[in-house]
Amino acid sequence: MATPSLPAGAVFRVSRGNFDPARFAEVDQMTRDTGSYLIPAIRQLDGLIGYYAGTSEEGSTVHVSLWRSHEDAQQMSRLKEMIVDARGASEAVGVSFIPIVNYPIAWII
């Protein structure tokens, strides 16, 4: 398997939230529904390499994205569809978020 090539300075951004596992169906549906407006908005941002979102029955939801640089990743902290619309939808179904972190990439396979 070939090792992927990433630009120097690439980072991945992790946004994670927790919720009552009894609300899994609601949170999972909300995650899918918010994709209808998050995907087109995020695709417009410079520096996006990849984006993944998922929800676990164990009471956790996560968004992991890969960016060319820390500055590119920081666009997410200003994206209305994320910080207003999706956050409101998430909180409405009981999701509480932990601080978002951008991680410089140490190694890849």
Describe each model-derived feature in a short phrase:
Residues M1-T61, R68-E81, G88-I109:
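Short S/T/G/P-rich N-terminal loop/turn motif that feeds into the first structured element of a domain
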